[in-house]
Amino acid sequence: MSSLEINNSCFSLETKLPSSHQSVEDSASEPSGYEAKDPPQDTLKDVDDVLEKPKDIIQFTAKKLSVGEVSQLVVSPLCGAVSLFVGTTRNNFEGKKVISLEYEAYLPMAENEIRKICNDIRQKWPVRHIAVFHRLGLVPVSEASTVIAVSSAHRAASLEAVSYAIDSLKAKVPIWKKEIYEESTSSWKRNKECFWAADD
């Protein structure tokens, strides 16, 4: 392998006026000498925050991961940075030629642990959206097994958050991989960082 991102809740908020109503701008007459002013920037920011709540998107899937699609899930007009981690299957391990990896996960615990990681990130950095997607089943060489994307107003927060996310995922989330070699042999592996899988 090389590395890993998930589905929480996405929603859009849409407000429409009935056709029989006019907007306040259209119907209200302006007093003489009235000068229109832009709303305060703080007010605009508050409105943006209400319309776009932070999202934690977590997904395990047997389908091929699209880095572009996962990245797009965290894009926000409030953010100037999207940072990514993409883990792919490499073609060798200790001199053996790897043709694919096979992933398994204990899903209830895995999803719960990733949500904890997302909460930890939000306590440490001012990020907007977080997406963590991980493949299950067979993943051929060069395909992505993990995609993590984080958006933030400035790049430092999202870069640090992505690094923390993959390190924590490898250490805490119950995911196993089987390396399948060219000579028709295979071997189950665990992440060395996993405290819960440590040898006695």
UniProtKB/Swiss-Prot annotation:
GO terms for cellular component: cytosol; molybdopterin synthase complex; nuclear speck. It comes from Rattus norvegicus. Residues 16-43 are annotated as: Disordered. Its EC number is 2.8.1.12. This is Molybdopterin synthase catalytic subunit. This protein is produced by a bicistronic gene which also produces the small subunit (MOCS2A) from an overlapping reading frame. GO terms for molecular function: identical protein binding; molybdopterin synthase activity. Gene3D superfamilies: Molybdopterin biosynthesis MoaE subunit. The gene is Mocs2. The keyword GTP-binding does not apply. CDD domains: MoaE (cd00756). It comes from the Eukaryota.
